[in-house]
Amino acid sequence: MEEDSQEDSNLPPKVWHSEMTVSVTGKPPSTVEEDGLPKETDVETIPEILETREPLSLPDVLRISAVLEDTTDQLSILNYIMPIQYEGRQSVCVKSREMNLEGKNLDKLPVASTVTKTPSPLITKERPSLPEIRQGGQFAVEFCKTQDLLFKKPARQTIMTTETLKKIQIDRQFFSDVIADTIEELQDSGTYNSLLQALSKERENKMHFYDVIAREEKGRKQIISLQKQLINVKKEWQFEVQSQNEYIANLKDQLQEMKAKSNLENRYMKTNTELQIAQTQRKCNRTEEVLLEEIEKLRMKTEEEARIHMDIEMFLRKQQQKLEERLEFWMEKYDKDTEMKQNELNALKATKASDLAHLQDLAKTIRECEQVIIEDRIEKEKSKNKIEQDLLELKSVIKLQAWWRGTMIRREIGGFKMPKDKVDSKDSKGKGKGKDKRRGKKK
C-alpha cells in the first residue's frame, strides 16, 4: 500500500485533478502592536460552505473514499511510530532548559496556512464540490508530512515533551475521527457536510485562540504600566518618609528644649509643692475613700471576669472535642478514599496489561497474514511463469510442425507430391527431367 501511495505522489500535477495544496507561511502574528492595536493575521479564511450539497456520483465517492481510507491508514501507522517521550535528568536546570527549548520550538512551528487551488481540466462544472472534499484529505496528508519532518529532527534541535506528544496525539485522533465520519457520510449519503462543519469549528477555535493571545498581550502591557506606577508610588513614599524623618528630628529638638524648660519648672514647682502638701493631704484622704470604693468595684469585676473565663474555657474545650472528632472522621475518610483510589489504579493497570496482550495478538495475526499474502504472490508468480513457458513451448511446436510440413511439401516426402500436366511438350519433358535430376542431386 505504501508503494501505491508513493507512486500516486509521483504522478504529474495534471493527474491530481483539483486538489487542495496547503502552504505554510511565517510565524504566529503578534496580536498587539506597540500602540496597542491588534495586527492583521496572515490566515486566508476559506468561505463557509455549509449548505446542503447534492450527492456525489458513485465513481467520485469511491475515489474519495479510497484516498480518505489511505489517509486513515497513514494516521494509524503514525500512532504506532510515534517516538517515546523525552526522559532526561530530573534536575531543576535540565527542566528549565527543556521549557526554554520547548518555547522556542513552539514559536518556530507554523500556525498560519493559506489554501490555494490548482485548476483541474478533468473535473466538469457539474461537480464543483469534489475539490472541497479533497481539501480535507490533502490537509491531513500535509499534516502527516509536517509531523514526519518534526520527528526526523535530532533531539538537540527538537525536544518532544509530554505535552507536545499529547497535543500531536490529540490532533492525530481528531483528524482520524473527522476522516472516519466523512467516509461514513460519503458511503451513506454521498455528501461531506461533517468535514465542512469540522473545518469550520476548528477555524473558530483558532480565532478564539488568537483572541486569547491578544487579551494576554494586553494584560501584559497593563501589568507593565502598573509596575511603572508602583515604582512611582514607591518613590513618592520614600520622599514622604524622608520628610517625616526630618519632621521627627525637628520634634526631637523641640523635645530637648521642652525638657530644659521642664527642669526649670520642676525646681520652681518643688518649692511650690512643699507649700501645698497640707492642702493635698486633705485631698488625699478624700481620694483614698474614693479609691477604696473603686477597689471594691474592681474586685467584683474581677470575679465576674473569672466566671466568664471559666465559661469560655468550657466552651473552647467542647469546640476542641468537636474538632478532634471531625479530624478523626476526615482521617478515616482519607484512608478509605486512598484505598479506593489504589484499587482503581490496580484495575487500570490490569486493563492496560490486557490491552497490551491483545495488541500483541493483533500484531502476530497481521504478521501471519502478511506471510500468507507473500506466499500466495509467490505461487501466483510461479503459475504465471509456468503458463508463459507452456505458451512458448506451444508456439515453438507449432512453428516446428509448420516448417516440417513445408519441407515435406517442397521435397515431396511421403504422400505430398506436386501435380503434373498431362499434355506436355518435349521441351517441357526435357526440362522436367532436368529438374528431376537436379532434385535427385539435391537429395
From Swiss-Prot:
Alphabetical UniProt keywords: Calmodulin-binding, Cell projection, Cilium, Cytoplasm, Cytoskeleton, Differentiation, Flagellum, Spermatogenesis
Compartment(s) of residence: Cytoplasm; Cell projection, Cilium, Flagellum; Cell projection, Cilium; Cytoplasm, Cytoskeleton
Region called Disordered, residue ranges: 1-40, 415-443
Record-annotated IQ domain positions: 393-422
Domain notes: The IQ domain mediates interaction with calmodulin when cellular Ca(2+) levels are low.
Annotated function: Component of the nexin-dynein regulatory complex (N-DRC), a key regulator of ciliary/flagellar motility which maintains the alignment and integrity of the distal axoneme and regulates microtubule sliding in motile axonemes. Binds calmodulin when cellular Ca(2+) levels are low and thereby contributes to the regulation of calcium and calmodulin-dependent protein kinase IV (CAMK4) activity; contributes to the regulation of CAMK4 signaling cascades. Required for normal axoneme assembly in sperm flagella, normal sperm tail formation and for male fertility.
Protein name: Dynein regulatory complex protein 9
Organism of provenance: Macaca fascicularis (Crab-eating macaque)
